[in-house]
Structure formats: C-alpha cells, structure tokens
C-alpha cells in the first residue's frame, strides 16, 4: 500500500503544476470579458469531478458544497480582468498570497464557524505569516511589461484591405493566437469584423475591451484591487467544505467534490445565461473554446490535488505547499515564456519576494511539528 505521505506530495505536485499553469492555454487567445471562458472552464472542471467521483465511488450533493463552488466562481470571474491589467505572473502572485493569508486567519481565529487550529510553535506560525505579508508588499513594486496587449488595440488596422473593408485576424495564419478581444459595448458575431458600408467607414467591432480603456496609470491599481478581492474569495471558498467535514469527521474530501464543482458550474452557467439575455450578442470565440476546456481540466485536476494533499499532509502542510507553489510556476511562465516580468530590478524584487514567501510558507508548514 502506498504511503499516505507519498500520495499527499503527489497531490501537491498536481496542484502546483495545475494551478500555476491552467491559465496558460488561454493566455494568448481572445476571451473578451471572460464570461464564456469561465463557463467553458467550469464544464472542463465538472468533467474531472465526475471522473473523480466515479473512481472514488461516492456521491454527495450538498448545498454547502454549492456555496463553496460559487465563491470560487466569483473569484474566477475576476481572473481575466486581472491578467489583462497586471499580467499573469503578478496577478497569480497577488491573489494566491492573499488567499493564503485569509486562510491563515480563518484557521487561526476560527472565522465563519471554523474550529480554531492550535499549533505547537505559535511564534513560528506568526513569523511565517509576517514573511508572507512582506512578500506581498514586495510584489507591489514589480512592473510587468504588457506592451503586446496594448499593441493589440491597433492590430485591426493591419488587416484593412484596399477596398476599405476588414478581414478577421483570427482567420489569418500570421496571427493564430491573437490576444485582442472584442469591444463589449458592440454587437458581435463570433468576433467577425464587418463594415457598415462599402467604403469601410465604420467598423462593427474592434479589438479593444473595457479593460483597454482604463488609463494606464490606473490599470495597476485596478488590477491589484481585483486581486485582493479575488484572493479573499479564494481564501474562504473551502470553508463551506471544511464546515461540512467538521460534522462528518470520517468523510473524505472526494465525498463532496462533485458538489463543489457543481457549484462552480451552476454559478457560471447562470451568470453566462443572464449576460446573454441582457447583452443579446455575447462574446464567444470559437478558437478559444477548446483551450478554455483544457484550462478547466487542468484546474479540476489541480483542485483534486489540493484536496488530496490537504487530506494526507494536513492543513498546515498540504495547503500552504499547494497554494504557494503555483506562484513560482506562474512566474516562471511569465518570465521565460510571456516575458511580462523582465529587467534586473523586477527580477531582483521577484527573487526577494520569493525569499520572504518561501521562508514564510516553510515556517507556517513546520509550526505544527
């Protein structure tokens, strides 16, 4: 029989890789305001939950699990705006760190009905928390480079033909992964560009989004504010499941996993349907559907890994490892692939942030031993 500790670390590895990479498949595809992306992502996650439920052989459908999934879905709707405003690396660093802090206080003080967690070395517990707070403060000084996203606002001009009309850059082989999205204020038909007359005087849609309209000097403030809200929601989204487990001591996290994932799906489904009824021309990009589904599958596997890790390694070990590791992975993507974080100053700040963050996580993890 496999050692539970080994299973726990395998779960942590799945969570770290999955959470740190699950937004990469859609990073260079147009997602508009993110509503259709979130809906398709939830379908991918629900498929993973269904498979996990079948493997585990149990099924529990609890309203409290639906609540937890809905809290996560609310946070997820903020992900696309955050990535557009401050980049993938900095965004994940912020909301993940804040989520860890919120989770720390929730367990430390027994917020929202949770049982207070008593640790062996309280001083180490608090010192670890301070290390995380310092790392979050350091993240504010990182200035990601998002020139590629800003340049996409004018990309449509490169597709203007001699007759004044426009062709769809999504269909052009030169730009197979165009990041620009459609103006949410105008009607759209699968991101097609149409002119209202033969002279091409007016364009029905553009690649500009509401996020592109935010003045540059306010983008970072808006992105950081959304990251804080997102982090809080992520930090409390597992509390409903923990409350359920307090009343079912012998239960496995997999017993309620389908309810948690169903909450994510139902919230996104209702949100997207409401948006479609109000907007009447929702932003749907055919080429983004499959990457969104893959993103959802990766998230679903990562979330299952988090549950396995927490169950086998404990909340003070499995949870910090699984929630801090993705920040490193996402930053590596941001530095080496997307080139959002570059420059000696930014890289030094990033390394310093990691030093405090990793030290804090280690102290938190070992404070109960």
Swiss-Prot record:
Per the record, the major location class is: membrane
Q: Does the keyword Membrane apply?
A: yes
Q: Which is one Pfam family of this protein?
A: TMEM144
Q: From what superkingdom does this record's organism come?
A: Eukaryota
Q: How does it sit in the membrane?
A: Multi-pass membrane protein
Span-the-membrane segments of this chain are 6-26, 35-55, 63-83, 85-105, 122-142, 221-241, 256-276, 288-308, 318-338, 347-367
The alphabetized UniProt keywords are:
Membrane, Transmembrane, Transmembrane helix
Could you tell me which cysteines form disulfide bridges? none
Q: Does the keyword Membrane apply?
A: yes
- InterPro entries per record: Sugar_transport, TMEM144
- Localization annotation: Membrane
Question: GO molecular function terms here?
Answer: carbohydrate transmembrane transporter activity
Q: Name one GO cellular component term.
A: membrane
Family of the protein in this entry: Belongs to the TMEM144 family.
PANTHER family according to UniProt: TRANSMEMBRANE PROTEIN 144
Please report the name of this protein according to its UniProt entry.
Transmembrane protein 144 homolog A
Source organism of the structure: Dictyostelium discoideum (Social amoeba)
